């Protein structure tokens, strides 16, 4: 990410193989560099971005000559400048923004991401497609033939162009790292994974990471712990995901699908995760064929309503989408309290005994 950016959408892979403008023209792009890299801001969608705060946002932060094409005022022409402006405003107001101010801030951050390509940080003459560029107004207002070109370039960059490049890079570095220790190595192979990754991990005997709510098969809504490969670590979540109890309350529709289809329970899913449900999910993991089942402490505590923390949101460790998030989670029990809770410890031992 450039130092002027706050959101990850403005970043790019490193190391990577970016494109020159000549490369892009040769691939069918029919526009200039500014159309690709400058925030695309037009009056016809500003209302969608700012809602009732549109007039205030335009007046304070944007310039225009014709009330159709807009660009940022110099003092707000990066996400970091926007961030600093609202940080100063928060300080004046006792540490908080009003709902309208937060809405404007989010809209401005979004508009800074209204680009199709981002400049390479080492060589600004080279360009990287913005991740998910097809979700931008800039893309939607292209002619159909240019949309096809952009999608072809986007998919080439993110799914094909780097495969051999990254494989070669991995094979130069990873064998030294894995060979330097007798410990088992686990790779965080979640999300958008290049096609070369599974083969490299298999060749170097690096364990995969399997999470039930983050399936690697795009055709299923949830993975099942029973389907995890032996060479893997199976878990309910990581420090970068919400703990089970918080996840249960995030999306009602997803929770209902999990309750009926993954758990096989009838009726309407409860609004909060009971200890019984938490134990059911953990029990599924205990029977996984994965070499390792390693669960977050918060999810173990969830099986006992007398032990777990009252507020599920207070159990969250990290929020990757928020670069300013402060890691402050600590177990609410002392180690001595945990060790002396014979009933809870017996409960955990009974569950883990099913692994053997």
Segments predicted by a language model, with ranges:
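Catalytic cores of glycan-processing enzymes that make or break glycosidic bonds
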Residues: 1-356
């Amino acid at each position: 990410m450039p130092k002027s950016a706050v959101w990850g959408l403005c970043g790019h892979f490193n190391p990577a193989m970016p494109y020159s403008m000549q490369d892009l023209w040769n691939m069918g792009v029919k526009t200039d560099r500014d159309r690709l890299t400058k925030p695309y801001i037009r009056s016809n969608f500003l209302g969608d971005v700012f809602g009732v705060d549109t007039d205030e946002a335009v007046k304070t932060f944007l310039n225009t000559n014709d009330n159709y094409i807009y660009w940022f005022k110099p003092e707000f022409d990066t996400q970091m400048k926007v961030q600093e402006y609202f940080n100063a405003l928060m300080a004046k107001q006792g540490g908080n923004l009003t709902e309208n101010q937060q809405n404007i801030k989010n809209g401005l951050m979004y508009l800074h991401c209204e680009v199709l390509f981002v400049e390479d940080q080492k060589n600004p003459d080279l360009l990287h497609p913005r991740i998910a560029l097809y979700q931008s107004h800039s893309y939607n207002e292209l002619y159909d033939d240019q949309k096809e070109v952009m999608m072809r370039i986007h998919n080439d960059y993110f799914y094909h162009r780097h495969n051999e490049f990254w494989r070669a890079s991995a094979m130069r570095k990873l064998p030294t790292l894995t060979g330097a220790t007798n410990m088992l190595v686990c790779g965080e192979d979640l999300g958008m994974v290049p096609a070369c990754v599974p083969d490299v991990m298999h060749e170097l005997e690096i364990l995969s990471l399997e999470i039930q709510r983050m399936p690697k098969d795009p055709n299923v809504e949830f993975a099942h712990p029973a389907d995890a490969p032996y060479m893997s670590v199976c878990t309910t979540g990581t420090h970068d995901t919400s703990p089970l109890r918080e996840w249960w309350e995030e999306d009602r529709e997803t929770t209902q699908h999990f309750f009926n289809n993954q758990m096989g329970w009838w009726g309407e899913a409860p609004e909060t995760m009971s200890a019984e449900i938490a134990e059911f999910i953990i029990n599924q993991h205990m029977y996984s064929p994965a070499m390792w089942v390693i669960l977050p402490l918060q999810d173990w505590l969830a099986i006992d309503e007398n032990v777990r923390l009252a507020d599920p949101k207070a159990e969250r460790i990290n929020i990757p989408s928020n670069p300013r998030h402060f890691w402050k989670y600590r177990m609410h029990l002392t180690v001595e309290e945990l060790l002396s809770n014979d009933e809870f410890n017996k409960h955990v031992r009974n569950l883990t005994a099913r692994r053997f």
